[in-house]
Amino acid sequence: MVRITQYNVLCAKLASKARFPKCHEKALDPSSRLTSILNKLEGEIKQNSVICLQELGREWHGDFHDFFQKRKYYMIYSSYGSWKSDYMGVAIAYPMEKYTSENTQIVRISDNVPKVPSPSPVSWWYSYFNNLLIKFNLMSKLSYNEWLESSYKANTCIMTTLSSIDNPSEKFVVSTYHMPCSFYHPKVMTIHVVELLKAVHKYAEESP
């Protein structure tokens, strides 16, 4: 039986008292959080789980790499964030004594978002100032262009095919993704869900 688990580790840089004022300080301490998270993953490793991670930032990337390597796990990692999110990304880790990976692909989902027609110079400037007004809450968000915003998101999806070492004919597809945090514009997230499902479905269909 294949066991797959996923965990959003919450990028260390984003776990601040300002964002989580009701949390105990120890719960926000990067060192304490890292220890707690790795302890949780130990239980999954004992079960030979395939582990999918989201919001893994640069500060912890090396720690997770060493953690998995010492336990004979291989980690596939993709970073897409900016300095504001510590260049966070997503990862898939699997036990090397149980599986091998093939046809691994890393896809920027926004590359598949249908492109809006190129604006004229006048409409470009209108859109530019319109977005500024929205940003500073000087205009209704009803005029927000979800399709254009969706095409700007850098979030990447990892897709890989794992095959059993004991029985190479047994193969399955694993993918992981972190949705853009556009909570005030849910249509952006809906667009990404649709494009994500299309990308994973296409990958699975084309996998041997």
Residue locations for each model-derived region?
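Glycine-rich loops and low-complexity Gly/Arg-rich segments
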Residues: 28-33, 75-79, 101-102, 116-119, ...
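Structured beta-strand-rich core segments of catalytic domains in phosphoester-bond hydrolases
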Residues: 50-180
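Alpha-helix termini
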Residues: 43-47, 97, 163-168, 201-208
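N-terminal, active-site-proximal structural segment of metallo-dependent hydrolase catalytic domains
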Residues: 1-70, 80-90, 125, 131-133, ...
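Feature marks short, surface-exposed loop/turn motifs that line or immediately flank catalytic pockets
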Residues: 11-13, 180-183
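Surface-exposed beta-strand edges and their flanking turn/coil or helix-capping segments
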Residues: 18-19, 50, 116-119, 187-190
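A long, amphipathic alpha-helix that forms part
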Residues: 184-208
